[in-house]
Amino acid sequence: MFKMKNITLALLMSGALVGCANIGDSYQASLEDYKQYEEITKQYNVKENWWSLYDDAQLNRVVGQALINNKDLAKAAVAVNRALYSANLVGANLVPAFNGSTSSAAQRRVDISTNSAISHKGSLNVSYTLDLWQRLANTVDAAEWSHKATAEDMESARLSLINSVVTTYYQIAYLNDAISTTNETIKYYTDIGNIMQTRLVQGVADAASVDQAQQAILTARNNKLNFETQRKTAEQTLRNLLNLKPNEALNITFPHIMNVKTAGVNLNVPVSVIANRPDVKAAQFRLSSAFKNAKATQKSWFPEVNLGASLSSTASTVGTALHNPVAAGTVGISLPFLNWNTVKWNVKISEADYETARLNYEQRITTALNNVDTNYFAFTQAQSTLSNLQQTHSYNQRITQYYRNRYNAGVSELREWLVAANTEKSSQLAILNAKYQVLQSENAVYSSMAGYYL
């Protein structure tokens, strides 16, 4: 009776000492906030393998190769497995723990001659902590949520990898076409230079005209060198993504950038369709993990009840070691609130961790919304830029022909023709870049929404 009164008193003291922050309301509000994004996202169909929309079997192969070979993604997979192992380890606390031991000993007196006394001992023990307050269950839940968050981290890495592969693939395609166009420009200026050289010999052109043509050739060659440097950097990026060494061939025949048909973006889908984003899911899961961990830590004020049982035996011979087993049982109660100063600050730390996770979640939501909104804007801008440049290029072609005719008629200087031709060639390169920007921006939309929405 006296012992029961002590246990009751301990429980009352524990309840009086809790005094923990009420984090349940803010956690529930965050869950409701996430639920609204889930409901909006469910209203639309999503195609998560958006790169297949380009109908490019080679691109599909390259993406698949990256998913298999990329080391960052492999490390993310290891992190997921580790989180799973940790969750399983924490879960082991919910089941009884077993251990056993055996030993043998020999004793004899050293002052007289006598035989040794030999004894053999064996024991089997089991212990179990009663989870009266669901503290252990909360700890297990926290570990499981952490594992789910790590799995979403891997999905984020996968999403980023795919986006990088697709954009780099089309960047190299653009640079290949830019180099080819620049080669045509160099030939164009070289032909003009040859004409000027011939006219100089004939005495119908001056040396300045020849120099101007050579100047245009050198400028075009420098542009080509710049494009080649960019292509080498892009190839390095793609090799890193595919985990290919310099001596290993890419084995890729890149398409012409202007022949790539864009998949488009459904701008009627609201920017709030973000629940499919793995980084948003990870932030929400980490919030749940921090909440469960804080609840478990708050319950560390409460008494802990441990049950134990053992079975042991001692004998002088191995054959009779189990003939006289002795059973024992134990009940232990620990009172952690007596160490109130340590428990108090551990609780405060866990609550601060929860608050950090809550702020991280809210920040991630805001970042995701702004990310989608900005990518929508960038896509529409890229489309408009491409359309304007294509129209401008038509005018530039007509202007170049105009000054070429005037020069041939002897009523205009070569410099005017070259300036017009340079503007035309620059706009041609700008169109290639603008087409790449359209592809890049639409892929940024797909990546920021974790798929193509219909």
Curated annotation (Swiss-Prot):
Q: Name one GO cellular component term.
A: membrane
What's any GO biological process attached to this entry? transmembrane transport
What single Pfam family name could you report for this chain, choosing any that match?
Answer: OEP
* Alphabetical list of PROSITE patterns matching this protein: PROKAR_LIPOPROTEIN
A GO molecular-function descriptor: efflux transmembrane transporter activity
> Which family is this protein grouped under?
Belongs to the outer membrane factor (OMF) (TC 1.B.17) family.
Question: What's the protein name?
Answer: Uncharacterized protein HI_1462
